Regions:
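Phosphate/dinucleotide-binding and metal-coordinating scaffold of catalytic cores
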Residues: 1-267, 271-344
């Protein structure tokens, strides 16, 4: 931390400078400078490291767990929070020294985890935060989750929140089926017991952790600043990947979210993977129906419009050099697929 104890300081090691890569090209370019976090968006942290700290449901569990030990989570510095994350976060980043809060807990049956989550979220019980937290992998988002490993690989399993309908897991499954049919890359996914949606982790391959960064981290936008526009996201995709195929894939995701009414398209719901110094967009995730959004609008606007039109989608595409005819073709294709698979 800086002397004011309010802003983080970061410097790449000599060894990393010799053959590493920038973990966040816009905020932390690969050079020997001493970087000081400039924005207060992440409570004095850098966006890329704030990505590792749980938000939403995970933050809620951690705060309650710490409160049992007499610790006010809101008084902890970013470095102290990262120390609690330690090696248990998503992606390749790990933080030493580690601070352990409580003890590891075995993964219960999924039905039991769902019941425990309901009890904690509805504040009927305060005794199971540790079980839920230690099986969440410090994942973000508002809904309960757990990490699970089976013969097929490593999975992130979602549970219902107290306000979700009974068929919420099946709905997300259907949305992923539709997204794949729309030409969108999604992780391998499955529906467990016809109610728990599970997606294979894309931050692990052959047992190795991959570096993953959200668009929010890379652009310096927190969840409290819903100012991202798909225009920015498309240009970020072009800048990082230098690949028009990846840009068109991101365009497809924008079109799908608008047509399928997934308005929970905030900056942490888009990620990039860096492997051997080369960036690519991650498989799409958190694809489901969300008509409420943010005051009824998309969290990420399209050319400044939170309720985007077809013309806005085309403008966003042509702005990044996708031909207008190709934009129209993709929009019509996705609209027809969603009409067939999602509109009931």
């Amino acid at each position: 931390m800086a002397p004011d104890n309010r802003h983080c300081v970061f410097q790449y090691s000599r060894e990393w400078l010799a053959d590493g890569f920038s973990v966040s090209p816009l905020e932390l370019p690969l050079r020997q400078d001493l970087f000081i976090a400039q924005k207060d968006s992440f409570a004095g942290n850098f966006g890329i490291f704030d990505d590792s700290i749980p938000d939403g449901y995970g933050r809620y569990l951690l705060s309650r767990l710490l409160r049992k030990q007499g610790i006010d989570a809101s008084a902890l510095t970013p470095v102290q929070m990262l120390s609690i994350v330690g090696k248990s976060g998503m992606g390749a980043l790990a933080y030493l020294p580690e601070t352990f809060v409580g003890e590891d807990k075995a993964l219960p049956e999924l039905d039991e985890l769902q019941d425990l989550a309901f009890n904690v979220l509805s504040e009927k019980s305060d005794k199971d935060e540790d079980v839920l937290y230690f099986n969440s992998g410090n994942s973000g988002g508002c809904r309960p989750k757990c990490l699970m490993k089976d013969d097929e690989g490593e999975w992130l399993v979602k549970f219902r929140h107290v306000y979700d309908p009974a068929g919420f897991g099946k709905m997300e499954y259907d949305y992923n089926v539709a997204a794949a049919a729309c030409g969108i890359e999604v992780p391998e996914f499955k529906l467990i017991d016809n109610k728990y949606f599970a997606s294979k982790r894309f931050d692990i391959r052959d047992g190795e952790r991959l570096h993953v960064a959200t668009a929010g981290a890379l652009l310096g936008l927190s969840l409290n600043e819903l100012t991202m526009d798909y225009r920015n996201l498309l240009h970020l995709t072009g800048f990082l990947t230098q690949d028009p195929v990846q840009v068109e894939q991101q365009f497809r995701r924008m079109v799908f979210n608008v047509i399928a009414e997934n308005k929970d398209d905030h900056p942490k719901n888009f990620s990039f993977i860096c492997e051997a110094g080369a960036w690519r967009i991650s498989p799409a995730y958190d694809l489901t129906l969300c008509r409420e959004g943010y005051r009824g609008e998309h969290a990420t606007s399209v050319m400044g419009n939170g309720l985007p039109t077809k013309a806005d989608l085309i403008d966003a595409g042509t702005d990044i050099k996708i031909p207008e005819s190709r934009c129209r073709e993709i929009i019509e294709e996705i609209a027809a697929t969603c009409e067939s698979l999602l509109k009931q």
